[in-house]
Amino acid sequence: MLREENQIFSELFEKGVEKYLRAGKKIWILINKKGHTWGTICHSCGHIPQCENCSVAINYYLLPSGQKMGLCHICKRQYLYPQTCAQCGSSKIKEFGMGTQKLAQLLKERFWAESLIVESETVRSQKKIEKLTLELDNLKSQSKNPIIIWTSLLTTPIKKWKFDLLIFLNADIGLNIPDFNANEKNFYFLYEAFVKHQCPTFLVQTMNPEHYSIRMACKMQKSDFYAVENEFRQAHNYPPYGELCLILYKDEIEEKLFTKVDQLHKELLYLQEKYQLKDLEIYTTPPLIYKIFGKYRYQVVIKGKEVRNFMDIVFSKLQLHKKGFKINRDAESIV
């Protein structure tokens, strides 16, 4: 189902939820963001507050007191909710994105429906799943039928508690990750849910209904997806048609980071030319998250059909481990 750009819920979502609530059916909504909102943005200058230790937006949680607390999901540092912009001083602060808490809030406002939020940590073991099943059974015995909001799919479905409607709220969010395997991960995220969780009805809300990973997952076209994905990977020398190695360096001093990575890049290009390994692509790029726990990060990507042979030469000529580089010789992702 297509969601309009300025809408949180599509028309089909609203009709589906209303229909199943009236019928007393069990609804499961999957949203992969915790908390209340993804972050805040200044409408005067566009500034988005980031964690001081990590280059990610500060997420906000709604406390029982009604106040909001900022939290970095990586280092867990806490922040106060901004009243004015730290960059320009404007008070035009707006929130963006939606987490589990805001979804529960909107469902209550729009449908007068109660929700039960289940975080991913709640279902990491069979014992915790059994505890959750008991909680759901207790709600049922009290004639309560809340909408269940999950932050992750269960690898082992709850056999005793069958849902009538499963909704993927942001089915295309994984496609925003700049990685060669983003399409495959997005496909399997949907496909495996359709296979494992025997819901009578699924709703997939997306801004990209024609994207092949979403379209083919909804139609259960696994072989067709593989054909398209294999063609893409073969054309760009991505695994399994090419090899991929990442060499990561991190430092608290940004200048030192750039100097080290630039020097390594030049040394690798020199070795490539010296040993005439032409079927290689060597370039530098920052990871998806540039700074983590106060350290800046940068990496050298080596891609092609002769990566392993080249890395054997690199190890014999350069003392990378002693210089603080972290090497992933069989990388499955570039972020």
Where are these regions (language model features)?
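Accessory helical-bundle/CTD segments and flexible terminal tails appended to RecA-like ATPase motors
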Residues: 1, 125-181, 192-335
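Conserved interdomain linker/interface between the two RecA-like ATPase lobes of SF2 helicase motors
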Residues: 1-43
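Amphipathic alpha-helical transducer elements in NTP-driven molecular machines
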Residues: 6-14, 39, 48-51, 82-85, ...
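Hydrophobic/aromatic residues located in beta-strands of well-ordered beta-sheets
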Residues: 27, 115, 202-203
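Conserved helicase/translocase motor-coupling segment
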Residues: 29-99
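Short hydrophobic segments within beta-strands
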Residues: 30-32, 118, 205, 250
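Conserved RecA-like helicase motor-core motifs
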Residues: 52-53, 59-61, 112-123, 276-283
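Long, charge-rich boundary regions
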Residues: 72-162
